[in-house]
Regions:
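Envelope-exposed proteins and targeting segments
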Residues: 12, 30-32, 40, 48, ...
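Zn2+-dependent peptidoglycan hydrolase active-site motif and core
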Residues: 47-84
Length: 151
């Protein structure tokens, strides 16, 4: 998976409430994405540039799905739910573009969250792999060098 992500879907560095847990079989139990802490009404952003593949309700929850540009065939596709979409199918989006807001539903997480998924074709992948280390791990922190002798 290429690290094409340029922003987190919500916030600056949201808490991961539930991580990636791939199922052993296609229909087996598991977690096909990650749940990120996000309050209702928070802006949801495209992590990378692409085209809106789908925006609308699925099983009573709003979903936005984006095909990511330049990620091969079939292209990588991110999904975000529950989201009140501000985009429509076919819209081109840039990395960081607002695609909707987090809806208030309590059916997936114990607290307010957004489920972020990643697929290539019908295969689910870990969406955190889209984020380069500098974004995934947070900013670099310089430490003082007091007491360190100069060369």
């Amino acid at each position: 998976v290429p690290a094409v992500g340029r922003v987190w879907p919500v916030g600056v560095r949201p808490g991961v409430l539930r991580g990636w847990d791939p199922p052993a079989t296609v229909y087996g139990p598991g977690h096909r994405g990650v749940d990120l802490s996000a309050p209702p009404g928070a802006q949801v952003r495209a992590v990378a540039a692409g085209r809106v593949f789908f925006a609308g309700p699925v099983a009573g929850r709003g979903v936005v799905s984006i095909e990511l540009s330049g990620t091969g065939e079939p292209p990588l596709r991110t999904t975000y739910e529950p989201v009140r979409a501000s985009v429509k199918q076919g819209d081109e989006v840039t990395a960081g573009a607002v695609v909707g807001t987090v809806e208030a539903t309590g059916r997936h997480c114990e607290g307010p969250c957004i489920h972020w998924g990643l697929l290539r074709g019908k295969t689910y992948l870990n969406p955190l792999l889209l984020l380069p280390p500098w974004l995934l791990n947070g900013p670099t922190r310089l430490l003082p060098v007091l007491g360190v002798p100069l060369p």
